[in-house]
Regions:
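Short glycine/threonine-rich loop-to-helix capping motif typified by GTGT followed
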Residues: 30-32, 61-72, 143-148
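A generic structural signal for short coil/turn motifs at secondary-structure boundaries
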Residues: 25-30, 108-109, 141-144
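Short, surface-exposed loop/helix-turn segments at secondary-structure junctions
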Residues: 136-155
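Structural helix-boundary/capping segments
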Residues: 1-23, 39-42, 46, 109, ...
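Short helix-loop capping/hinge segments that flank enzyme active sites or metal/cofactor-binding pockets
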Residues: 14-16, 68-119, 123, 168-179
Length: 203
């Protein structure tokens, strides 16, 4: 969007959607899972073809690898702030920076090697799907403003370097908002935005 690239306009054909449950499916709360599956059933009634994405073991390490790489990069970027103003940083930020400082060069190289393997495995999916649908979070948005929630289910897409976005998907019994997440192929930003528009219009 910052580049000014318009969303693609899907043709008359409905999308081929891959449901990716992630290795963390059992940790996702019931309202989020139920809302996602119900939305997919509605999309099927509008012509979408939904199929399960097979488990991709190459993607499993990315959830932790992304955190390690991000913490390491943050530790380098905020080295001055850590050294000179450590007491003014939040406990969570200090912990992240210290974890990044402790990450060894060998561990980082291994994380990047796993990332490259995962990117190759992910690229092989796109003969069968137009987009991936997956949970956006483990549950509803947290109440209040103390936290923006757990980023766990976004990390793999960030490290894969592929477009991902979230769409509103109802509310839990407390009235807190739920979301579904869409992911695309590498470089497929415009196509993913176009399919997001189709989903919002269809159901």
């Amino acid at each position: 969007m910052l580049a000014g690239v318009p969303a693609s306009t899907p043709g008359s054909a409905a999308p081929r959607i891959g449901l990716y449950r992630t290795p963390h499916w059992e940790r996702i709360d019931a309202p989020s899972r139920d809302a996602l599956l119900a939305r997919l059933r509605r999309l099927e009634r509008h012509g979408a073809r939904v199929a399960e994405v097979p488990d991709l073991p190459a993607l499993h390490p990315l959830y932790q690898d992304q955190r390690d790489i991000m913490n390491h990069q943050a530790a380098r970027a905020l080295l001055h702030e850590y050294r000179q103003h450590r007491e003014q940083l939040s406990p969570a930020l200090r912990a992240a920076l210290e974890a990044g400082q402790a990450c060894s060069p060998d561990a980082l190289r291994a994380a990047w090697q796993r990332t490259r393997r995962a990117r190759r495995a992910y690229a092989e999916l796109w003969a069968d799907y137009d987009l991936i649908v997956t949970p956006a979070a483990l549950g509803a948005a947290p109440a209040g403003i103390a936290s923006s929630g757990d980023s766990l289910l976004n990390r793999n897409w960030s490290l894969l370097g592929v477009p991902a976005l979230s769409l509103p998907n109802g509310a839990d019994p407390r009235g807190l908002p739920l979301a579904m997440q869409l992911a695309g192929s590498h470089g497929g930003d415009a196509a993913l935005l176009g399919w997001a528009r189709w989903i919002e219009a269809a159901a």
